[in-house]
Amino acid sequence: MDLLFGRRKTPEELLRQNQRALTRAMRELDRERQKLEAQEKKIIIDIKKMAKQGQMDAVKIMAKDLVRTRRYVKKFITMRANVQAVSLKIQTLKSNNSMALAMKGVTKAMATMNRQLKLPQIQKIMMEFEKQAGIMDMKEELMNDAIDDAMGDEDDEEESDAVVSQVLDELGLNLTDELATLPPPGGSLAAGEGRAAEAAAALADADADLEERLKNLRRD
């Protein structure tokens, strides 16, 4: 039985075979339990029927059968639980075996990579990469400086002149608008002198009124 097509079965194949056998056993136990449960229901119906007819001897015999049937049902439930526990253990073994095989493969791959990984060569490659990258940066900087020297001055002068012209134009418009909103100089001075004269006259009237009241008080 350990040979499959002239060769020995692997542990994985043996585990799968035993797993299938346990699954079939659990199905058989479930079917037998269901038959016993159906028989239990039938016995209960017969007991009630005989009890109504007054046949107590038959009732006692069927009651014993009912007790035995219920015990068998419990035994089948226990047996199925045990078989299921064994099936779970086999499944755990399969999982552990799969994990071990995977770890074995990973270990081999890591060993191969470590053998192929030569640190001096990698270090040399990185140093050469940094060197070439530095040379490329220097060349790019020199090219940018040359382009700026050749094209940047004229463009900068033209752009700066345009900005200055725009700013001066905006300032000129703003100053013109503000000057237009100011009142004429003569009108402002005349209005100020008129308000000062009115204030002086009001003060003089108040002083005269106060002086008149003091005179009246002295007469009284």
Curated annotation (Swiss-Prot):
GO process terms (BP): endosome transport via multivesicular body sorting pathway; exit from mitosis; late endosome to vacuole transport; nuclear membrane reassembly; protein transport
Motif (MIT-interacting motif) on chain: 208-218
Keyword Coiled coil in record: yes
Residue numbers carrying N-acetylmethionine: M1
Superkingdom of origin: Eukaryota
Membrane topology: Peripheral membrane protein
Matching InterPro entries: Snf7_fam
Gene3D superfamilies associated with the record: 6.10.140.1230
Coiled-coil features, chain-numbered ranges: 12-52, 195-220
Keyword tags: Acetylation, Coiled coil, Cytoplasm, Endosome, Membrane, Protein transport, Transport
Pfam family, one: Snf7
GO cellular component, one term: late endosome membrane
Positions of disulphide bridges: none
Protein location: Late endosome membrane; Cytoplasm
UniProt subunit comment: Probable core component of the endosomal sorting required for transport complex III (ESCRT-III). ESCRT-III components are thought to multimerize to form a flat lattice on the perimeter membrane of the endosome.
Function, in words: Probable core component of the endosomal sorting required for transport complex III (ESCRT-III) which is involved in multivesicular bodies (MVBs) formation and sorting of endosomal cargo proteins into MVBs. MVBs contain intraluminal vesicles (ILVs) that are generated by invagination and scission from the limiting membrane of the endosome and mostly are delivered to lysosomes enabling degradation of membrane proteins, such as stimulated growth factor receptors, lysosomal enzymes and lipids.
Family named by the database record: Belongs to the SNF7 family.
PANTHER family: CHARGED MULTIVESICULAR BODY PROTEIN
Name under which the protein is recorded: Charged multivesicular body protein 2a
